Amino acid sequence: MIERKALIFNIQKYNMYDGPGVRTLVFFKGCPLRCKWCSNPEGQLRQYQVLYKENLCVHCGACVPVCPAGVHTISASTLRHGFAEGAQCIGCRRCEDVCPSSALAVVGEQKTISELLEVIEEDRPFYETSGGGVTLGGGEVLMQPEAAVNLLAACKQHGINTAIETCGYAKQEVVMKAAQYVDLFLYDVKHIDSARHYELTGVRNELILSNLTWLLENKHNVKIRVPLLRGVNDSEDDLRGLVEYLRPYQDYKNFKGIDLLPYHKMGVGKYKQLGWEYPIEGNPALSDADLERVEACIRKYDFPVSVIRH
């Protein structure tokens, strides 16, 4: 029997922000949204990609002849890495191997459920002493539903606490199947207004809110996460719309409150490495005073709220 594989782009250990206790984060590649502030753009496409660090490149051209896909090209003494029109990286990593200056990195790796579970199990002592476990994120983990559900089920069979970070944009049957094996959903609500949500992410939010309602009404543990940007979703009206939507579930034991995730620029450099333009102009980061205002606004409606600073 061939074991299901997942396309992963990172595994992060000793995380303290994305679920209770010390956690291992497994990042699944591929996402149906295109959030303008995305800090993991290398997780958006469900395919191999090349990150090119121009400042490290010595322009030796060693990557060009070893690439079977023609991703690396040279013409008129100009090297181009990973951006060749019509070429797609196949994940062979030969360019990585021959690059003398570590200027190239292939993003994406196929891992079996057994391989992932082995990595997750390495930190069991930390989970047991801290109440931690594993969190699956991305990208969007539910874009690889079979692999995600198989890994979640395997973790539960091994007594490991499970959480997923999700944008909620998935078929409801996928959410229902995953929910059997999830101890906590870290559920993004990027904007409560569907038209505005479309402008910011490329999709409307009706499916997202429908899945959220199903999870809350069926007693699955949910913590709402709001990526917070100044002038985008931090107004009194924006926040009131969010809490009014959540008000029917305010006293549910499975509703675990609201996390605010302030905008940051930690992923900006990766856009250039992918050959992409950064979608946001200006700086929508909130000041400490802005964050205090937003917190106070939510608290006045008697909702538990925390600011998560990465």
Curated annotation (Swiss-Prot):
Keywords assigned: 4Fe-4S, Iron, Iron-sulfur, Metal-binding, Oxidoreductase, Repeat, S-adenosyl-L-methionine
Output the superkingdom of the source species: Bacteria
Q: Which family does it belong to?
A: Belongs to the organic radical-activating enzymes family.
Q: Which organism was this protein described from?
A: Oleidesulfovibrio alaskensis (strain ATCC BAA-1058 / DSM 17464 / G20)
Fetch the Pfam families from UniProt. Fer4_12, Fer4_9, Radical_SAM
NCBIfam families referenced in this protein's UniProt entry, alphabetically: cutC_activ_rSAM, PFLE_PFLC
Q: Report the protein name in the record.
A: Choline trimethylamine-lyase activating enzyme
Annotated EC: 1.97.1.-
Q: How is the cofactor bound?
A: Binds 2 [4Fe-4S] clusters. One cluster is coordinated with 3 cysteines and an exchangeable S-adenosyl-L-methionine.
Q: Which gene encodes it?
A: cutD
Reaction catalyzed: glycyl-[protein] + reduced [flavodoxin] + S-adenosyl-L-methionine = glycin-2-yl radical-[protein] + semiquinone [flavodoxin] + 5'-deoxyadenosine + L-methionine + H(+)
Cysteine pairings via disulfide bonds? none
Q: Example GO molecular function term?
A: metal ion binding
